[in-house]
């Protein structure tokens, strides 16, 4: 499937899944007996059982995960044809106690690919993406973060670690099912690094 078609399909399927999780419970009370809500952009009541509806949304979720995996792989392969750089040495030194060598050796980065970053705003359900990790290539929106933001690097390297541990398909499946559970450990590490880098003031540590 061409990249643009896969991107459009994933956006449509993701929208449907999001609408289901946001509106399914209210819609269930509005449907007549013997009918179930089907929500893809809008909700309609159709004949069927709760099991039929659950199976339908499992298929929707599978399609969404497949679309995300396709976007990740195709975007990464396109980026791999362009110049990328290893982790800056001072960033690597700062984080080497927190990651296995495989993560630090695998990860590379580049700066300012707007097509990838803007797509990630939608596909990764994040309104303001400052960096995105595509398997082993991290794309930063601005060079200052790439060169000096150790906390953001920690966040993105956590995703490199997840790709290595789970594989791309499983990463996409987990992210589609519950993106917060995938992002949570990355944000936790990012916040921890930020706090360690914040000097204590005369009145005590900054909260």
Language model: regions and residue ranges:
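Auxiliary, metal-adjacent structural segments of Zn-dependent hydrolase domains
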Residues: 29, 82-132, 137, 192, ...
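Short, contiguous pre-domain boundary segments
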Residues: 70-81
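N-terminal low-structure segments adjacent to metalloprotease catalytic domains
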Residues: 2-70
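Active-site or metal-binding loop neighborhoods of secreted/extracellular toxin and effector enzymes
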Residues: 178-207
